[in-house]
From Swiss-Prot:
Species whose genome carries this gene: Pectobacterium atrosepticum (strain SCRI 1043 / ATCC BAA-672)
Flavoprotein in keyword set: no
SUPFAM superfamilies hit by this protein: ALDH-like
Protein name, entry field: Gamma-aminobutyraldehyde dehydrogenase
Binding site for NAD(+): A146, P147, W148, K172, P173, A174, E175, D209, S225, I226, A227, T228, C280
Gene for this chain: patD
CDD domains assigned: ALDH_ABALDH-YdcW
High-level lineage: Bacteria, Pseudomonadati, Pseudomonadota, Gammaproteobacteria, Enterobacterales
Amino acid sequence: MHDKLLIEGKLIAGNGEALAVFNPATGEQIAAIPQADLHQIDAAVLAAESAFAHWGQTTPKTRATLLLKIADAIEENAEVFAKLESLNCGKPYHAVLNDEVPAVADVFRFFAGAARCLSGSAAGEYLEGHTSMIRRDPVGVVASIAPWNYPLMMASWKLAPALAAGNCVVLKPAEQTPLTTFYLAHLLADILPAGVVNIVFGRGADIGDALTGHEKVNMVSLTGSIATGAHILAHTAASVKRTHMELGGKAPVIVFDDADIDQVVDGIRSFGFYNAGQDCTAACRLYVQRAVYDEVVEALGKAVATLKIGDPRDETTELGPLITEPQLERVMGFVERAKALPHITVVTGGERVKGTGFYFQPTVLAGAKQDDEIVQKEVFGPVISITSFDDEAQVIGWANASNYGLASSVWTRDIGRAHRLAACLQYGCTWVNTHFMLVSEMPHGGQKLSGYGKDMSMYGLEDYTIVRHIMIRH
């Protein structure tokens, strides 16, 4: 098992306290991995700064070629990555192998192509005797903080656009889930020039703060909680660093009475519970028009009850565990408080699964009201709420009455209605008659407390650049 930091092209052991890493499916410890110490954080940032002097000047073709090599290496090691991610996160192995690892490789391939298409505005004479042009240049040293729910995928979302734009990166994976990132470090050491990517490890409260607050870091990119985002913004405010924040979500799923109910049920069964609901875009906050409310509640309850919970190594397993015991207890707390409300009905689930591991039953809670905690707060587990609504105006108001603004979906056969709602919903993405679908070519990111900046797409690449005006007198 790889457990080495990557600093200046060398794989080295951390000099700090060892942190225990667990298998969520069993609750057993699988590794004890030393953190970086503060000297190693400093060395990683300085290595990135030194490498940037050359990497920032390389041609797009050169960067693209190396990104394609990374994609090839990920595909060649797909089974290893899938086994490690499944072991460390409790994800079903087949889902990681067939869904997530190919998507990771595709992100690197997309940004390899995008690197060769990045350009500024056309030159022109806007002042007599002077020619102006726009450059898009790399930011410099980027400190990237990845979350625990999709460790490898989020590492790719952080690394690929930053490298494509010509930046150097110091990446810190979540302390709970470092295994695939360490394996990636082992591969990157043989592909990239020394210092272009550095990978460190440790708790956010000390190692994360040292990294994001380092004076030589030009930009911080985070995928994480609102609390972590707010902390980093406060911590780095004095240095006015550039920041990219992808934070929490509480996706409204709006089901009209003309929707294809079978399609709705199949979709929510998948998109509300993938990765045990530990996804910022999970289809978790259902608003169902009153005429079909009872039908949807009954059908969805029956469908969700068939989700198979089990060993991540079993090809028939659909739902794995939550990431840690504290996360399980957090989800249980949300559900218990909801169950205590007289108007809420547990349609299915609602309990911890007996036995080992951090499993929670897939849960459907009907009768929820707009102001209920279960409707307003991000649970980040296999739990969905269902609320009835009367008309468009009411449901648009309810959907937008949220601190979150990441993802949403509308289910209807009326294309005019779909366009109206898509124009009104205050979310970074609105799907129609589907949910959860992401592609490398399209941007992902939120608004309000869900953050700002875009992952993937050309917009994601541009986020890691600085726009500069060059004016030449002649």
